Every structure is written in C-alpha cells, then in structure tokens.
C-alpha cells in the first residue's frame, strides 16, 4: 500500500479498535495493546478489500488518486477521507456527499458519534448561530 493510502487504513481505521480497548481498560496510554478488538478491525478491513473497485491482489498498486477517481466517477459509493479532500470531490455535488460512521461491531458504538482524525474540531450548536 502506498503512502497516500497507508495512513487511512493503518492509522485512522486502526484507531477504532485501539480506542475501544483503551476505553475498556480505562487508560490513555500503553506500551503495547492487548488486541482485544483486532478481530473487529480485521472484519472491517475484509469488508473494505472484498468490496473494493479492484481485486484485493491489486490494492497494493492503487493510490489515493485512484480512490478519488473511483468515487468521483461513481465507480465507488464510499470514500474514506477527510475534509481536506473536498476540493477533489466537490464536483459530485454537496447533495451527494455525507458522513457515515464506521462501525466495527462494538456494543453501544451507534451512540458514540463520528470519529475524527484531526487536531482541531469545531462544533457549533445550530441555536447559537
């Protein structure tokens, strides 16, 4: 997997099982994870690779630019990325864009909200605007 995709799947996606392990253990740091939710991570990873726009054996040759093109042309319906990619996908129209949580099968996760991978996140209440 090239560097343009590496961070999405080995960093951001991996944050989900690590978050739940930290939450269960009541910790915010550790030298080594136990791997409590690694099977959940594997299942979401398998869902990704077995439903990609290319064969799993071809994934190592694909880049973030390929993923963007697949999404913009309608070959892909889901596209895991951040707001910084908006300029590259805005031509599909705002009515065709949305945010979807990534569930990995942990009890209660439907109440957690959207995971973000950013240093800064501003949220304003509609009533305060």
Locate the predicted segments by residue.
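Sec/Tat-exported extracytoplasmic proteins
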Residues: 17-20, 48-56, 75, 89-93
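Alpha-to-beta junction loops
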Residues: 73-81, 95
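Short helix-initiation/N-cap motifs at beta->coil->alpha
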Residues: 58-72
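Stable alpha-helical elements in mature extracytoplasmic
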Residues: 5, 9-12, 37-48, 67, ...
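Extracytoplasmic/periplasmic substrate-recognition and gating elements
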Residues: 53, 91-129
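Beta->alpha turn/N-cap motifs
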Residues: 64, 81-86, 118
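Glycine-centered hinge/linker elements that transmit conformational signals in sensory
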Residues: 29-61
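Extracytoplasmic/periplasmic solute-binding protein
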Residues: 1-30, 76
């Amino acid at each position: 997997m090239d560097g343009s995709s590496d961070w999405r799947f080995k960093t951001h996606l991996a944050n989900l099982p690590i978050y739940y392990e930290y939450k269960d253990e009541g910790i915010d740091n550790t030298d080594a994870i136990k791997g409590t939710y690694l099977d959940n991570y594997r299942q979401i990873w398998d869902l990704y690779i077995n439903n990609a726009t290319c064969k799993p054996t071809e994934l190592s040759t694909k880049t973030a630019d390929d993923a963007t093109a697949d999404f913009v042309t309608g070959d892909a319906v889901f596209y895991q990325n951040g707001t910084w990619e908006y300029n590259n996908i805005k031509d599909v129209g705002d009515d065709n864009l949305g945010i979807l949580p990534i569930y990995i099968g942990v009890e209660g996760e439907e109440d957690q909200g959207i995971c973000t991978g950013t240093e800064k996140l501003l949220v304003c209440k509609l009533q305060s605007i």
